């Protein structure tokens, strides 16, 4: 059975998460109880809650524990609850809601026009395509059927001396 986020931004402030830490806990619990699928950049409710909360709080993901006590503005709480409600009730993947996704350690703009980048090819790129390719650094690379272009752009980033073409229909 799914779980619906019933708290709205206009309800009593006593009931709403007021700090980053409270928001992380709340979002994680809601996501755990819902029937959403993880696998679009995260594989569990806590990590997805962190991405969502840090996004609305405008904090870097690599923030330390000191941010847990940081208060959230009413606007941030309203945005958080809206995103969480869409995530749970419409089952929209978080990268589509936030318009950002990570691939091969790089951040990309993301929306429903292309598949969310989550290919195992990221690990191949980061590992210089070892053990399947052991020659000199490639001079030309083609990303065919590139979609949003994340693979080709990541390859261009990690192989700066290569000429990279991205092609899609």
Enumerate the language-model features and the residues they cover.
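SAM-dependent Rossmann-like transferase core, predominantly class I methyltransferases
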Residues: 68, 78-169
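N-terminal auxiliary segments of SAM/dcSAM-dependent transferases
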Residues: 8-104
């Amino acid at each position: 059975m799914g779980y619906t986020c019933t708290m709205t931004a206009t309800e009593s402030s006593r009931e709403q998460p007021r700090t980053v830490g409270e928001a992380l806990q709340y979002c994680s619990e809601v996501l755990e109880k819902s029937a959403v699928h993880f696998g679009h950049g995260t594989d569990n409710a806590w990590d997805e809650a962190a991405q969502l909360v840090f996004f609305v709080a405008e904090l870097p993901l690599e923030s330390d524990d000191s941010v847990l006590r940081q208060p959230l503005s009413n606007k941030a709480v309203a945005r958080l609850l809206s995103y969480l409600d869409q995530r749970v009730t419409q089952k929209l993947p978080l990268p589509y809601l936030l318009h950002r996704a990570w691939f091969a350690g790089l951040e990309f703009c993301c929306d429903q026009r292309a598949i969310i980048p989550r290919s195992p090819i990221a690990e191949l790129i980061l590992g210089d395509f070892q053990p399947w390719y052991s020659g000199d650094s490639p001079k030309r690379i083609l990303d065919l059927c590139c979609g949003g272009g994340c693979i080709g752009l990541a390859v261009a980033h990690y192989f700066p001396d290569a000429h990279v073409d991205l092609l899609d229909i």
